[in-house]
Amino acid sequence: MTSGQADIVSQGTSHKTFFERYFELLDGQDPHRSLELVADDLEFSIQWAADGSRKSSQFVGGREELRGFIDAGDTDGWAHYVLHSRVSGNVEFALGETRWDNGERIGTFLAVAELDESGRMRRYMVARSPVLAFPG
């Protein structure tokens, strides 16, 4: 399964944005391939808002902790969809949704990444909430 996209702005270029490529790999057959886009000195924070099945939580760390987060995840039956994306220098922002395969929205996410000189993610912060939805 691959990530969807809508209304992407990438400073006038037609290539995929960083987050389109990252989520496509993360949602694909081998989620660990997404680590190809991650710098060795990564720092990250993933924040999940509470829903009916879990309390609010935050996951932090480096590249190996992100690998562990990927290992613990269940990626079957859903994917990331980038709705809007902007780039400012070496920083990219993406607003998107996670959706079940049938198209039903699971939650909304806001992600930001600082990219190194090789285009790999060096800093990453993402927050996800099931409460708010934005127009695509």
Predicted segments, located by residue:
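Short charge-dense sequence patches
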Residues: 13-24, 45, 58-64, 119
